[in-house]
Amino acid sequence: MDSSKEAALLALMDRTGYSMVQENGQRKFGGPPPGWEGPPPPRGREVFVGKIPRDMYEDELVPVFEQAGHIYEFRLMMEFSGENRGYAFVMYTTREKAQRAIQLLDNYEIRPGKFIGVCVSLDNCRLFIGSIPKDKKKEEIQEEMMKVTEGVMDVIVYPSAVDRMKNRGFAFVEYESHKAAAMARRKLIPGTFQLWGHTIQVDWAEPEKELDEETMQRVRVLYVRNLMLSTTEETLRSEFSQLKPGSVERVKKLTDYAFIHFYNREDALTALESMNGKVIDGSPIEVTLAKPASKDGNKRFGPRNCHNGVTAAGGYGDSNFLFRTRNDMTIGAMGNGLNAHALSLPYAVDLDRCVYPFLPGSTLVPVSLNTVKPSQLSSAVSLLDYYCHKNDWSLPEYHLYSLAGQEGKVMLIYKVVISSTRRSFMPDKVCTILEDAKELAAQNALWNLDCSSGSSLNVSPPAPSGSGFLSFGCRSLPYPAYPMASISPPLPISCSSAQRLFIPNQSSFL
């Protein structure tokens, strides 16, 4: 940094009275500001700032963000070279000032032709730890994590939907603060760290987005997880209706989780208090209020650019509900960001899914599917192709069928055939949209391959290319069930051979 820039930073410190300290790859301005008494501001007061020019520093940035109100702390992420990393966090003293910063400064032209992005920062204290042995218990995982990292408060482990004595190959580790979690991630992220002889995978667990109290006050749907695969919707309706017969409007079960819709909120809250922790069919269940999906999604401008919250519509009543997913895979919840059953979890994987300009003269290099990272695949169809390719299997064939649904709708369903394995898979749901039917069929195939492969397939984040297993996940596509009328081939559709779509005759279905 040149002397003029240092002088500008010193002048800023003199004007404001704030201190400035650089540590752990970030430079902290303030925190607390002069004269501040009491604890730091609670959650919801911090904004994330992305797309900052790399040669811009606090002397230019702080005055811009002061327009929105009193700043408690400004944290600029720094490179070893002295340049910033393109993003920062600004904590205000009140929620209103943070919201004002978003309104005023999102897409603000910070320099000619340079626009920054500003959005709510989610104070993350959880890490996702993948590729752990499936026979390890919560206590063992917590003990090991406390040995290698500081500030561990809790470990969240979910049992396999197939074998409740095993975990799903991943865990969530809760730390006492975002700083403690960041330090732990920094220590574990290189990819060479091992637990029990396994190279573990580490990433941020995407924090649950806060919803306004007014929205949550209208929710009358319960989210139930940790169910046995054999538990039926009828069993759930009976169990949740015990306190008040007739209070349950409908039940939608998707593998080992379900949504219980009540006619009114009071009955839902009563059932929540009574049923949380209850054992159904030998499995202790977890019950929470279902969270409506936010209207603005999970847009963010960080180094990963986008955090894609997974939502699912259809069959869930008055509004969409947030499928809180993370790299876990279960039949109904192949989750956002290579996830699935973390439907039960308040997290989703963040994928680099922003669009960038294709510059004239750019060099194009042919690549094969082997060179693509699993984290770059966001659909079950792509992941199934990837999985087959990695295992030297034939690529999946999609056989398309139709049936007459309710109200005369034409329903679509795919059967997935993997010839080299002599196996075929068909989901138990049908769709009205062709692409959804294909995605659902691929999800179902991935789920069944996971169930049948035992420990050979780990359902945690994408593993290094040299590892002996593959993890995967994709967006969840729950659909209302329709009576299975006689299935027949649909009308011909135009498609390229590359799509490998098959419109079979009736006999091939049997």
Curated annotation (Swiss-Prot):
Recorded hits in Pfam families, A to Z, give: DND1_DSRM (PF14709), RRM_1 (PF00076)
Q: Where in the cell is it found?
A: Cytoplasm
A GO cellular component term found in this entry reads: nucleus
User: Sorted alphabetically, which keywords does the UniProt record give?
Assistant: Cytoplasm, Differentiation, Meiosis, Oogenesis, Repeat, RNA-binding, Spermatogenesis
GO BP: any one term: oogenesis
As for what it does, the entry says:
Essential for male and female fertility, playing a crucial role in regulating germ cell development by ensuring the proper progression of meiosis prophase I.
> What is the official name of this protein in its record?
Probable RNA-binding protein 46
- What's the encoding gene here? rbm46
